[in-house]
A protein has these predicted regions:
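Carbohydrate-interacting regions of secretory-pathway proteins
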Residues: 20-196
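Sec/Tat signal peptide C-region and signal peptidase I cleavage site
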Residues: 15-19
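Sec-dependent N-terminal signal peptides
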Residues: 4-13
Length: 196
């Protein structure tokens, strides 16, 4: 028995531990860049995005680039709640180049992958998976990007698994989006990334 336990300890000590990094400190927007006039602020430890005076697109991008990673976060949509999580993205003004994992109202393909200013929808979840979304409640999203493969989960439900050469060549930050049109408010918390 002692030999078995010692063997397990030896194995565990040789496996490199990959640290999870918080993207949001719960205090301020340190480590993030705001793009556009939409509102991004901290309220009682939560990250909030809200339509601003121009009712346009807005983005909040990490200062750091992430290539291969596993990201988990929680979001709560209020009103329309159309938003998204961009991966390997760059933002110039309010024009983003990259891929969005959709965060949207029921029936609008949350968890699907959309390429902005490019090919449009690359993959949408099967319609029956829409029931995983809890509108007006806290939802947990997980996004895993390795090489040319992207996967998403919503509240532990696998939403998509997709391979795309162009995504595999992408470089950039993780960014949150608020859609244009006005009247949108989304709260975010527990944004944790594990670089792979």
């Amino acid at each position: 028995m002692k030999t078995f336990i010692l063997s397990i300890v030896c194995i565990l000590t040789t496996i490199p531990l990959i640290a999870q990094e918080p993207l949001f400190n719960g205090i301020d927007l340190d480590g993030w860049n705001i793009h556009g006039t939409e509102l991004w602020y901290v309220d009682h430890g939560l990250l909030v995005c809200e339509s601003g005076p121009d009712k346009g697109y807005g983005y909040l991008s990490t200062s750091k680039y992430y290539d291969d990673f596993d990201l988990t976060l929680e979001f709560k949509q209020e009103s329309n709640g159309n938003s998204g999580v961009f991966i390997r993205s760059t933002v110039e003004g309010t024009k983003v180049s990259g891929w969005q994992v959709e965060v949207a109202p029921p029936g609008s393909d949350t968890g699907g992958v959309y390429e902005s200013y490019g090919r449009g929808w690359l993959i949408k979840p099967e319609k029956e998976k829409d029931k995983a979304l809890k509108m007006g409640e806290w939802n947990t999203m997980r996004i895993r990007v390795v090489g040319d493969q992207i996967e998403s989960w919503l509240n532990d439900t696998p939403m998509i698994k997709f391979v795309d050469e162009k995504i595999g060549q992408g470089k950039g930050s993780i960014a949150l989006q608020i859609h244009d049109g006005g009247g949108i408010k989304v709260r975010w918390r527990n944004l944790l990334v594990t670089p792979l």
